[in-house]
Amino acid sequence: MKKHSPVEITYFGIQAYTGTTKHMGGLASTQELIELCGIGEGMHVLDVGCGVGATAAFLVQQHGCRVTGIDRSEGMIERAHQRANAEGIQDQVVFKTGDVQDLPFAAEEFDATISESVLTFVADKAAAIAELARVTKPGGQVGLNEETWLKPPPTEMITYTHNTWQIEHDLPESGKWQSWMVAAGLRDVRSKLLAFDSTREGTQVFRYRWRDMWLMMVRSLDLYLSNSEFRKYVKARRRLPKGLFDYLGYGLYVGRK
């Protein structure tokens, strides 16, 4: 197995090490977001918070797009390059590190811009959405899949999301996400609010090849057996608060530049 950078025992550090990223709704929500954004063959798409490159690969292979992916994690970008090379799509994708609140791109560069479970973790969500709008061409769509409180949560659930998923900034409800998109100058803003669904979540695995899944399991097991800090991390986060997903869901938010 190719040696990877030393693992950070953090929510994103673990994902980068194992080679897996996820968002609520899995591949089913990715496909729905693509359809809502009208993404199709020949389009140049920006995938903000691209993680290990699973959505980028899907856009290239299933929709004939060119994709630029950006992520703040060097470990994620390393895995994304590995995936692109393994799947023979390295000529259709570009991956680089960067900050969603200050994107390293010219204005009006992309036909569409998407973000899946990324802005949830960003301090200034309004500024980030404004950046997504800035780099999107006129008439292009900006699409988000982001965690959303379905109703005001009790304190214990806010604490759990902060401690488990390292969501350091308050999650908004649906109306706030939409208002930020309007403030960024996006038009025809629409949203679809979704509750946790185990069947839909099961489509996470379809974002990966069987070899990827095997490597993820091997890396996870190796980390669990060899790293006491990781074992403590898992133990402390094993139990979900009762009724969490009565409160926590996600929304698909789309607006036109």
Report the location of each language-model feature.
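Conserved alpha-helix/loop element of class I SAM-dependent methyltransferases that forms part
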Residues: H23-E41
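Class I SAM-dependent methyltransferase SAM/SAH-binding core
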Residues: L46-V48, V52-D102
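A short acidic, Gly/Pro-enriched loop at the edge of an enzyme's catalytic core
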Residues: Q101-A112
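A short SAM/SAH-binding and catalytic strip from SAM-dependent methyltransferases
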Residues: A112-D124
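A short glycine-rich, Lys/Arg-flanked "PGG" loop and its adjoining helix->strand segment in the class I
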Residues: A126-Q141
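Short, glycine-/aromatic-enriched active-site segment of Class I SAM-dependent methyltransferases
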Residues: E147-E168
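Short alpha-helix
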Residues: D170-A184
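Conserved Class I S-adenosyl-L-methionine
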Residues: R190-K257
